[in-house]
Structures are given as structure tokens and as C-alpha cells.
């Protein structure tokens, strides 16, 4: 949007400030399927360490006696969310990235940089105050749907920004670099709508010129 205004205007300067100081302007979000096969990690415990065996026993117990949130925070899900988050954060046209990984890393920094176990995460999820959980965790996970949401903003003031190419790059590299199979990550948000509108406008102009 910023390119529609002259650099001397207040709105341009304001949007540039948001871009440079507050992490970007145009929102984009990625919905990632984090479902996994039941007991995938615990299918064969014969060669596992005692610690891993205890983890599998805890998971089995939580599935038997608890709610879905008790066993949702598995290493597979957390690693997948972190991988997508880190990939998006590495892109030069991307500003602020927010996801469950953001919260996890704040917690890990307080926990002597140690990752939490699934059991610890389940306990934290239950014991954290409701208002904090609703504002800082719930927007980024859908337990019943086995989905994680990664929210980000694009740096609109980047001189070489190519929105269509960026969207294509993200869709492609989520599969080739991050390892998310096609169909398990959905890209949406205002940037997608804006890009679609521009592409429709360009196509309409081409057709109009061709008709003339």
C-alpha cells in the first residue's frame, strides 16, 4: 500500500515508521496442519532410552485419563511450529512473526534455555491464567483441528518487494525447505487478498488493451 503515497506525505512516513520500528505493515498468516499418527513416536519402544519410555508411558496415561490438551503439546508439533516460524523469520521481506514458538522461547529462556516436556507444557497450559491463555496462546493453536497459526507482517517499504513472488516462494519453500507436505500449510491474509486484487486488475488491463 505504501507505494501509492508520496514519500513526503504523512501517511507514507507513518507507514514507513510502522514498517521499520514495529515489524511490518501488511498482515499474512500461515495455518499449519500439525496432526500426527496416533502413538507415532511411541510405536516401537524397544530401542528407546528410559527417559523416552517414560515419556511414552506419560502420553499413554494422559490419553487414557485426560483431555486432548493434556497430550497435544508433543515434540513433533512443537518442532513443526518452530521450523515454520524460523523459516518465515529468515525472509528479508518479513517483519514480526508471532506463533506458539514465540511464547515457547520466552518460557525456555526463563527455564535455563531448556525445552519443556509435553507433560510440563500441558500443566502450564492448564495453570496459566485464562485471560493470558486467551490472548497469548489460543490465537495460535486450534487443538480440536490440530492446527497452528503463524501470524506475520510484511515490510511494505522494502524497495525490492514483489508480493506475488514472495507468496509463491513461501508456498514452495514451506514444502522444499521446511518439509511441510503440499496441502498441509495454507497461506492467507490481507497480503493474499491484495495480491489477488492486483493480479485481477493487471489481467483486466491486459484484456482491455488487447480488445482495443
Predicted feature locations:
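Extracytoplasmic
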Residues: 1-212
